[in-house]
């Protein structure tokens, strides 16, 4: 996933995940503990935001903070990463502070104290939304996965149970992407923006803006 977000093709992410799905029992794949950063890795925001070579010395890494431009990039990609994490098969695991905007390179710079009262409100709200949506939709908890787009910077997959259906769509590139997705219902709702889309022929046509995301559900 990190390779995809940092410039790799979505097809390589799909192929890697499908190889895991095909080689593991379903309970293992759908019950996996999925994480993007831990106490043994640099902070997710730092890795995704960094645009210049990482500082080489320990002293430099200890005090390095992303520039405003890097921070904006990091937050944008962190939202994409977390949307995929929270809607993918398995259980999303969140390293404390990633939801608050903590930065840092390798241990011990990734193990700072939680920034009580100084959290990033935008990221906090985003993660709360993702958690609420995952609790609300059975499909995101236990639904089977099907890929509908995985080429270049565009990725789209669905999760489905007998009574619930969601599609995650992500554009990790700097240009708009147009997708055509299968959709049975006459309407689809992007629960992230509350925008509705009409579908009359079993196909849903939509455009994802640069670094755009959608989480589509059926309209009740």
Language-model features and meaning:
Residues 1-107, 159-160, 168, 172-178:
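Conserved alpha/beta catalytic core and glycan-binding cleft of carbohydrate-active enzymes
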Residues 74-75, 87-94, 98-220:
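Carbohydrate-interacting/catalytic domains
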